[in-house]
A protein has these predicted regions:
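Sequence-specific DNA-binding recognition helix
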Residues: 74-110
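Membrane-proximal linker segments that couple transmembrane helices to downstream signaling/catalytic modules
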Residues: 1-77, 81, 99, 115-120
Length: 120
């Protein structure tokens, strides 16, 4: 546990999110750690200790938040393309993760304007 290293990782992750790097199709943990100028082990430890989840889960949640926004902002673009724009490389995984995290399908999310509980 190194507080200075964790602070550095936190700052690098903030920039990574601002730049929407989470939308890049799956890279290895080694590649991402390298981009963040840290080791794979330090990145794993940061997520386990600070975030209380693994990196892939966190990245998936960022992608789902992005897709929720895109589904409402851009109603002309197909749901499959929205999934790709948010960083999902395959349609089935996008739908599965969306339903798991949001509790409804991307189509239901879009049709309800982001309020799936208020179905008309």
């Amino acid at each position: 546990f190194n507080a200075a290293e964790f602070k550095r990782i936190e700052k690098a992750l903030e920039i990574w999110v601002q730049e929407k790097r989470f939308k890049e199709f799956d890279k290895s943990r080694e590649e991402i750690a390298k981009e963040l100028r840290t080791s794979k082990e330090s990145l794993h430890l940061y997520f386990a200790t600070v975030m209380k989840m693994d990196f892939r889960t966190w990245r998936t949640e960022l992608r789902i938040e992005e897709s929720k926004k895109l589904l409402l902002e851009d109603k002309e673009t197909s749901i499959n393309i929205i999934g790709e724009m948010a960083g999902f490389s395959d349609r089935a995984n996008f739908y599965r993760q969306f339903v798991k995290i949001v509790g409804c399908s991307p189509k239901e999310w879009r049709e309800s304007n982001g309020n799936p509980d208020l179905k008309s």
